[in-house]
Structure formats: C-alpha cells, structure tokens
C-alpha cells in the first residue's frame, strides 16, 4: 500500500526535458498553456497534442493521428495529464508528468479519466518515470486552481462515512470489505491538508508540498488497495458526476467535488459546519456561481443523483440510502449562501 510515484520538487524543471527525454517526443497540453512553454522544447518534439475533449472516441482519434513517438510529456491540469497517460498506455512509451496547478490528483494515478456517453470511466495503465512539481510553475497558476486540489482530499471525510454506513447497513460490496487500515492511511493524507490549510491557501513551498504529498498518496491509493475506491471517493464525487452529466461541460475538478463534500456531509449529518470551515480556510471556490452554475443546476443534479448512481453502476452511499427532497435542497442552498 506504500508504492507511490517518484516525485521531484524543484524549479526550472520544464526547461530540462530537452536534455534527456526520449526522442521524438510529444507534449500533451492545453491550447492556452502551449504558447507559454513552446520555447522550452526543441526539434525533438513532434507535437503538441492540444487536448480538446476527454470523450474517449475523440481521445482515441487524437492518439491515432500522432506520428511515431518514443516518449510523452503531460503538461497541464487533469485533462492534459490524463491524455498523456492514455498516449503512454496506447503507444507503450515512457511518460513524464508536469502538473501546472494543484487542481487534481491525476498526475499520481495510473488510469486515465475519460468520458463514455457522458459517464466517467477510468481506463488504461501508465506509471510515469517521474512527476515533476515546480514550485514557481505551480505558484504562477491561478489561485483558484491551486486551492481546488483540496477537494480530492476533503472527499475522504464523506467517503469514510459512506463506507462505514454501507458496512453497518449490510450494503457493503463483497469485494470491498471495510478496512480500518485503509481509512487510517487516508486519514494521514487528510490531516496533513487540514493542518496545512493556511499554507495551501498561500501556495507557499510548504503548502505545495503538503497538498502534493497528499494528492500523491491519494492518486495511487485506488490501485494500491486492489482497485478499491471506498476510502478515497464517495457520494461527493457522485454529485460532481451528476453535474457534469447534466451540464455537459468541464469543471475545475476540485470545486464541484468540494461542493459535493459539503452537500453530502449535510445529508450524512457528518460535521458539515466543520468541513466547510476547513474548505473556507483553504479558500477553495465551491459556490455554484463561482463555477458558472446556478442553484437550479445543483438542484437538478441532486434530484437525479440516485438515478445517476444506478445508471453509472456506482457503489452504495448516502446518495442511495437517504432521500434528497425539496426541503433538503432549500436548506442547503440557504446554508451555503449564508
């Protein structure tokens, strides 16, 4: 359970790739990022591959259109890093990952998150040679991106409640029996974020290390526990999946996940005020209007949540156990707008 990706912390790390990466190589990144980094690469580069969509059929087309490459560099947020994993998996080439913000744990996970008919699926297998965390590069990202990464750790708060509830109500999956050891390991990563909330808010070197080390643990935890998601993901992620399904638009991953943590902790009656206070200390944006959503969007996602859980084949959580009625929707709206 302790195998984690090699992670290198430093400065000026992107400029070094041309000195050692296998040639020819491709950089998977985003259109808005590429102009900033284009001069860091040399004529051994045959890209870039600019990510347009995570719909699997489109990712497949993009990968098929690539020329021969001997390495891939993921440079960006979750979509760029997941696309790089997909390329490494399909082409069987070495992978190097460079997250440009602390927005998600994608750099530290083996599978790529793609969409199939609007439903999230985790596919493939790719382990990077290393993940490169450049302090100055991370700090140059918008603060809302860097703070949002706590969502992938704060979700342990609701996930652990869901797992215990499933055990106690006889709804626990046979393949994922409750394991206090896994919960305790996750708690270490969770507590690190809570204890360093102010440093993460400030994106100090200390804060970058604290959040990235927790994301490093969490990203690998799915595989390291035998493909068990129970200690790292629960109903809070299902809220995000339902929002994505309904709206058909991308999000900064940790923002809707954090909203899901608050909503589902309220449904669980699981210290919602306390976990909200932690989110506020970090400064993560979780209100719908900060994500370009309306409360009508959130309400619609909550209403279809049990149905979406069933459609997507997700596990038993508070979203299946407790009804979400109009009174709950109105009450949580008032609470989060206060």
Question: Where do the protein language model's features map onto the residues?
Answer:
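ATP/NTP phosphate-donor binding region
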Residues: 1-71
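C-terminal charged capping/lid subdomain of soluble metabolic enzymes
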Residues: 153, 162, 166, 170-172, ...
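A glycine/threonine-rich phosphate-anchoring loop and its flanking beta-alpha core
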Residues: 91-189
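Short glycine/serine/threonine-rich phosphate/pyrophosphate-binding segments
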Residues: 34-36, 79-86, 104-107, 232
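A short, small-residue-rich loop immediately preceding and capping a beta-strand
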Residues: 66-87, 91-102
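Solvent-exposed alpha-helices and their adjacent loops that cap or buttress functional pockets
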Residues: 19-20, 64-67, 121-126, 130, ...
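Active-site segments that bind and position negatively charged phosphate/pyrophosphate groups
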Residues: 180-289, 293
